[in-house]
Amino acid sequence: MAQIGINAWVWSSPITTEELGRIAPIVAGMGFDLIEVPIESTTDLDYRKGAEIARSNKLAVSVCAAMGPDRDLIHPDESIRTNGMNYVRHCIDAAQTLGAENLVGPLYSAVGRTWQATPDERRRDLDLLVHQLRELAGYAGEHGVMLCVEPLNRFETSFLNLASQAVEVVDEVDHPACGILLDTFHMNIEERSIGDAIRAAGSRLRHFHTCENDRGAPGSGHVPWDEVAGACRDIGYTGPFVIESFTNKVKSIARAAAIWRSFAVSQDRLATDGLRYLRALL
């Protein structure tokens, strides 16, 4: 049976120790297998207590990086690059303590930063990212954590938009602790064929975000879910499928993710509808 999870951002932000303690029993009670924990501030969550919360609710864990303006592995400003590297190392340590196998997200640049680049400039940025990720993957591997690099849509980054671009990066990093996260919300915008994108990622695919075209519950929009499931079967994907959505009740996350309306009658309903659909699909 597929491992199905949900990101705690569906209900709240930031995810503090208290919020995780509130949300985890809800997630477990609904029948999810995994909770994805975003790390916004490095002081929000007591990771040892977080691990206890997850264990007591029989939930596996993944960790989601929040790449803000001062956390960017390829920024022209060296101090911002250094801060980004330190933040990702912190997330790796957090993942190990939480018992998470995967650290996921756009592990290259700040969300929302876009820029024009010549082919030579892009090659320079790629070389820098490969160097940075190779170092981080070494650290992650020592801590039993897999880095999962996520392409985003063109409105959130200009650097990695396609599965094929993530494949290029991961192949150049060439480290067993560096893989790919694909997200159907972003693929629906950028990929000409979602199935082909998944097949291109192949064995590099280690994490999967199941998001509807409007970031609502899977099955409520027009993402071609049969194509998604078929392609995942084609490549023998056995990793988690995680619902990632957001609440418009928390202004900071609503603004960051451009969430201006609700996608279901309640966040609980979004979660249960999505879980029911994915269980039937997968």
Question: Across the structure, where does each feature detected by a protein language model lie?
Answer:
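Histidine-acidic metal/acid-base catalytic patches
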Residues: 1-28, 99-101, 160-182, 187-282
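N-terminal small/glycine-rich loop or linker at the start of catalytic domains
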Residues: 1-11, 63-75, 107-117
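Active-site-proximal loop/turn and secondary-structure-junction residues that shape catalytic pockets
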Residues: 10-12, 39-41, 67-69, 109-111, ...
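N-terminal substrate-binding region of glycoside hydrolase catalytic domains
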Residues: 23-44, 65
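Conserved beta-strand positions in the central sheet of alpha/beta enzyme cores
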Residues: 36, 62-65, 104, 148, ...
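Active-site-adjacent beta->alpha loops and helix N-cap segments on the catalytic face
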Residues: 43-53
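Active-site acidic/histidine proton-transfer and metal-coordination neighborhood
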Residues: 55-56, 79-179, 261-269
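A short acidic, helix-capping loop that chelates divalent metal ions and anchors anionic groups
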Residues: 70-75, 111-116, 155-156, 189, ...
